[in-house]
């Protein structure tokens, strides 16, 4: 059933750029354990949408570890391959509709994933960049009583610098109301947030500067390579 539904989604709606396999527990109160055939799901996505990124419980984009929009100070993109195990993502994911979980922050004792110290002794590394998922409201769905709890322009701007600014992509949820519309407050705050970030980043502070380093490892790794545009 799941493969049939996934196939329908992947073949009937044009180009899909992202498939989000949530790690949140889908088991009910009957005590039965749900077993997921992850490799089969991945193969289905690759077959019908080969350019789509498979996120969270997938091999392409990793979850940052919380739903509060909080990331590690250094959110590395090259990490040990073991971090992509879908089962371990499930264990850390939300098990019920819990606002306390949604507000959980990154703590100092959470695993350092990609520093040189963390990678020492690791033999299997992968490119596995992080994605930050959070909502413009307290939760994922629309509730009229939360119309005055929408993230402000300043809060959204801070969220941007704490996610994108820390080397992660930002997935911002907009709960639609019962008419299928985004609330005017949510929309206005998002537009003003975008304009605020564009204004703050309009001037490239590095333009025209000549990078220097206290030490260099040969000409190939000279400081000027930072701005030479050769990737």
For each predicted feature, which ranges?
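Mature catalytic domains of secreted/periplasmic carbohydrate-active enzymes
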Residues: 1-230
């Amino acid at each position: 059933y799941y493969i049939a539904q996934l196939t329908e989604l992947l073949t009937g709606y044009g180009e899909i750029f992202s498939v989000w396999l949530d790690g949140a527990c889908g088991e009910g109160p009957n005590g039965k354990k749900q077993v997921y055939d992850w490799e089969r799901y991945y193969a289905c996505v690759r077959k019908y949408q080969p350019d789509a990124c498979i996120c969270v419980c997938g091999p392409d984009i990793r979850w940052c570890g919380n739903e509060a929009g909080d990331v590690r100070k250094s959110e590395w993109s090259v990490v040990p391959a073991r971090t992509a195990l879908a089962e371990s993502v499930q264990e850390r994911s939300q098990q019920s509709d819990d606002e306390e979980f949604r507000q959980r922050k990154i703590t100092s004792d959470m695993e350092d994933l990609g520093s040189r110290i963390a990678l020492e002794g690791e033999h299997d590394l992968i490119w596995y960049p992080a994605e930050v998922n959070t909502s413009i409201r307290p939760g994922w769905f629309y509730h009229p009583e939360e119309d005055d709890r929408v993230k402000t322009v300043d809060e959204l701007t801070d969220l941007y610098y704490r996610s994108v600014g820390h080397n992660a992509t930002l997935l911002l949820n907009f709960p639609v109301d019962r008419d299928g519309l985004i609330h005017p407050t949510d929309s206005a705050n998002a537009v003003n947030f975008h304009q605020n970030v564009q204004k703050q980043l309009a001037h490239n502070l590095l333009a025209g500067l000549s990078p220097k380093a206290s030490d260099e490892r040969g000409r190939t790794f000279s400081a000027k390579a930072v701005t030479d545009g050769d990737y």
